[in-house]
Amino acid sequence: ARGVVERFCQKYDFPLIVRDMAAEGLAIPDVKRKLKRPICSACGKIKRYFFNQTAKEGGFTVLATGHNLDDEVARLTSNTLRWDSAYLSDQGPMLDDSDGFAKKVKPFWRVTEFETANYAFLMGIENHYAPCPYSTGASFSTLKSLWLELEDKMPGRKMDFYHGFLERGKPAFQSAEQQEGDVLSPCTRC
Protein backbone atom coordinates (compact mmCIF):
# COMPACT_ATOMS: atom_id res chain seq x y z
CA ALA A 1 0.00 0.00 0.00
CA ARG A 2 2.81 2.40 0.84
CA GLY A 3 4.36 2.00 -2.60
CA VAL A 4 1.03 2.86 -4.26
CA VAL A 5 0.77 6.07 -2.21
CA GLU A 6 4.41 6.99 -2.86
CA ARG A 7 3.98 6.57 -6.62
CA PHE A 8 0.74 8.59 -6.61
CA CYS A 9 2.31 11.46 -4.67
CA GLN A 10 5.39 11.43 -6.89
CA LYS A 11 3.27 11.43 -10.08
CA TYR A 12 1.20 14.43 -8.95
CA ASP A 13 4.01 16.18 -7.06
CA PHE A 14 2.20 15.96 -3.72
CA PRO A 15 4.24 16.12 -0.51
CA LEU A 16 4.16 12.89 1.51
CA ILE A 17 4.75 12.58 5.24
CA VAL A 18 5.60 9.06 6.39
CA ARG A 19 5.63 8.06 10.06
CA ASP A 20 7.30 4.71 10.68
CA MET A 21 5.57 3.00 13.58
CA ALA A 22 8.55 0.70 14.20
CA ALA A 23 10.83 3.73 14.52
CA GLU A 24 8.31 5.19 16.98
CA GLY A 25 8.60 2.02 19.07
CA LEU A 26 5.16 0.73 18.09
CA ALA A 27 5.72 -1.79 15.32
CA ILE A 28 2.27 -3.17 14.53
CA PRO A 29 3.45 -6.84 14.34
CA ASP A 30 4.92 -6.48 17.86
CA VAL A 31 1.76 -4.86 19.19
CA LYS A 32 -0.29 -7.66 17.58
CA ARG A 33 1.81 -10.37 19.24
CA LYS A 34 1.35 -8.77 22.65
CA LEU A 35 -2.43 -8.35 22.27
CA LYS A 36 -3.20 -11.90 21.11
CA ARG A 37 -6.51 -10.72 19.57
CA PRO A 38 -7.55 -8.71 16.49
CA ILE A 39 -5.46 -5.56 16.47
CA CYS A 40 -7.86 -3.20 14.67
CA SER A 41 -8.82 -1.13 17.71
CA ALA A 42 -5.26 -0.68 18.99
CA CYS A 43 -3.90 0.00 15.50
CA GLY A 44 -6.61 2.60 14.93
CA LYS A 45 -5.78 4.37 18.19
CA ILE A 46 -2.06 4.38 17.35
CA LYS A 47 -2.71 5.78 13.88
CA ARG A 48 -5.15 8.41 15.16
CA TYR A 49 -2.57 9.56 17.70
CA PHE A 50 0.16 9.97 15.06
CA PHE A 51 -2.19 11.49 12.46
CA ASN A 52 -3.25 14.10 15.01
CA GLN A 53 0.33 14.73 16.14
CA THR A 54 1.49 15.13 12.53
CA ALA A 55 -1.37 17.52 11.75
CA LYS A 56 -0.61 19.68 14.78
CA GLU A 57 3.17 19.68 14.17
CA GLY A 58 2.67 20.52 10.49
CA GLY A 59 0.25 23.34 11.20
CA PHE A 60 -2.52 21.65 9.21
CA THR A 61 -6.00 22.93 10.04
CA VAL A 62 -7.89 19.82 8.90
CA LEU A 63 -7.08 16.11 8.87
CA ALA A 64 -8.91 14.28 6.04
CA THR A 65 -9.17 10.49 6.02
CA GLY A 66 -10.30 8.06 3.33
CA HIS A 67 -13.11 6.47 5.34
CA ASN A 68 -16.01 5.58 3.05
CA LEU A 69 -19.66 4.66 3.53
CA ASP A 70 -18.80 0.98 4.10
CA ASP A 71 -16.32 1.92 6.84
CA GLU A 72 -18.78 4.29 8.49
CA VAL A 73 -21.70 1.85 8.44
CA ALA A 74 -19.54 -0.97 9.85
CA ARG A 75 -18.27 1.33 12.60
CA LEU A 76 -21.79 2.57 13.37
CA THR A 77 -23.07 -1.01 13.57
CA SER A 78 -20.20 -2.04 15.84
CA ASN A 79 -20.72 0.94 18.15
CA THR A 80 -24.48 0.31 18.21
CA LEU A 81 -24.05 -3.39 19.02
CA ARG A 82 -21.96 -2.31 22.04
CA TRP A 83 -24.20 0.73 22.78
CA ASP A 84 -21.01 2.79 23.01
CA SER A 85 -22.59 6.17 23.59
CA ALA A 86 -19.26 8.04 23.64
CA TYR A 87 -18.39 6.87 20.12
CA LEU A 88 -21.98 7.20 18.91
CA SER A 89 -22.09 10.82 20.08
CA ASP A 90 -19.16 11.91 17.91
CA GLN A 91 -19.40 9.56 14.92
CA GLY A 92 -19.93 11.35 11.67
CA PRO A 93 -18.27 12.82 8.60
CA MET A 94 -16.79 15.75 10.55
CA LEU A 95 -15.38 16.25 14.03
CA ASP A 96 -14.55 19.78 15.12
CA ASP A 97 -11.14 20.58 16.49
CA SER A 98 -10.87 20.73 20.24
CA ASP A 99 -8.18 21.13 22.86
CA GLY A 100 -5.14 19.45 21.30
CA PHE A 101 -7.08 17.65 18.56
CA ALA A 102 -7.14 18.63 14.88
CA LYS A 103 -10.43 18.95 13.00
CA LYS A 104 -11.21 15.69 11.18
CA VAL A 105 -13.22 15.20 7.99
CA LYS A 106 -14.21 12.15 5.97
CA PRO A 107 -14.90 13.45 2.44
CA PHE A 108 -15.72 9.96 1.06
CA TRP A 109 -18.45 9.14 3.59
CA ARG A 110 -21.14 9.00 0.89
CA VAL A 111 -19.13 6.73 -1.43
CA THR A 112 -18.82 2.93 -1.14
CA GLU A 113 -15.61 0.93 -1.49
CA PHE A 114 -16.96 -0.49 -4.74
CA GLU A 115 -17.62 2.97 -6.18
CA THR A 116 -14.16 4.15 -5.13
CA ALA A 117 -12.48 1.13 -6.73
CA ASN A 118 -14.50 1.64 -9.93
CA TYR A 119 -13.53 5.31 -10.09
CA ALA A 120 -9.86 4.47 -9.58
CA PHE A 121 -10.01 1.83 -12.32
CA LEU A 122 -11.80 4.11 -14.80
CA MET A 123 -9.41 6.99 -14.12
CA GLY A 124 -6.30 4.79 -14.32
CA ILE A 125 -5.40 5.40 -10.68
CA GLU A 126 -3.34 2.60 -9.17
CA ASN A 127 -5.19 1.13 -6.21
CA HIS A 128 -4.27 -1.24 -3.39
CA TYR A 129 -6.97 -3.91 -3.07
CA ALA A 130 -5.47 -6.33 -0.54
CA PRO A 131 -7.02 -6.36 2.94
CA CYS A 132 -4.90 -5.61 5.97
CA PRO A 133 -2.81 -8.71 6.76
CA TYR A 134 -3.84 -8.41 10.42
CA SER A 135 -7.59 -8.16 9.84
CA THR A 136 -8.31 -11.90 10.04
CA GLY A 137 -11.08 -12.40 12.59
CA ALA A 138 -11.81 -8.69 12.85
CA SER A 139 -15.43 -7.76 13.49
CA PHE A 140 -15.33 -4.95 10.90
CA SER A 141 -14.73 -7.46 8.10
CA THR A 142 -17.74 -9.48 9.25
CA LEU A 143 -19.93 -6.39 9.56
CA LYS A 144 -18.90 -5.14 6.12
CA SER A 145 -19.80 -8.52 4.62
CA LEU A 146 -23.20 -8.48 6.33
CA TRP A 147 -23.86 -4.97 5.01
CA LEU A 148 -22.82 -5.97 1.47
CA GLU A 149 -25.36 -8.79 1.58
CA LEU A 150 -28.07 -6.54 3.02
CA GLU A 151 -27.36 -3.83 0.43
CA ASP A 152 -27.61 -6.43 -2.33
CA LYS A 153 -31.08 -7.43 -1.12
CA MET A 154 -32.19 -3.91 -0.10
CA PRO A 155 -30.40 -1.31 -2.25
CA GLY A 156 -29.85 2.04 -0.57
CA ARG A 157 -30.10 0.65 2.96
CA LYS A 158 -26.52 1.62 3.91
CA MET A 159 -27.06 5.27 3.09
CA ASP A 160 -30.53 5.28 4.69
CA PHE A 161 -29.13 3.79 7.91
CA TYR A 162 -26.17 6.13 8.13
CA HIS A 163 -28.00 9.27 7.10
CA GLY A 164 -30.84 8.43 9.50
CA PHE A 165 -28.31 8.07 12.30
CA LEU A 166 -26.74 11.43 11.49
CA GLU A 167 -30.15 13.14 11.48
CA ARG A 168 -31.80 11.44 14.45
CA GLY A 169 -29.47 9.13 16.37
CA LYS A 170 -26.35 11.23 16.73
CA PRO A 171 -28.14 14.25 18.26
CA ALA A 172 -29.72 11.97 20.88
CA PHE A 173 -26.35 10.44 21.81
CA GLN A 174 -24.69 13.88 21.86
CA SER A 175 -27.34 15.12 24.27
CA ALA A 176 -26.83 12.11 26.55
CA GLU A 177 -23.03 12.48 26.47
CA GLN A 178 -23.22 16.19 27.34
CA GLN A 179 -25.19 15.26 30.44
CA GLU A 180 -23.15 12.32 31.67
CA GLY A 181 -20.08 11.69 29.50
CA ASP A 182 -16.39 12.33 30.04
CA VAL A 183 -14.71 15.27 28.37
CA LEU A 184 -12.11 14.30 25.76
CA SER A 185 -8.74 15.84 26.55
CA PRO A 186 -5.16 15.28 25.42
CA CYS A 187 -3.05 12.72 27.28
CA THR A 188 -0.98 14.49 29.95
CA ARG A 189 2.06 12.28 29.21
CA CYS A 190 1.97 12.82 25.43
What residue spans do the PLM features occupy?
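ATP-dependent adenylation/nucleotidyltransferase module used to activate substrates
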Residues: 1-101, 110-123
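ATP/NTP-dependent adenylation/nucleotidyl-transfer catalytic domains that generate, transfer
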Residues: 88-190
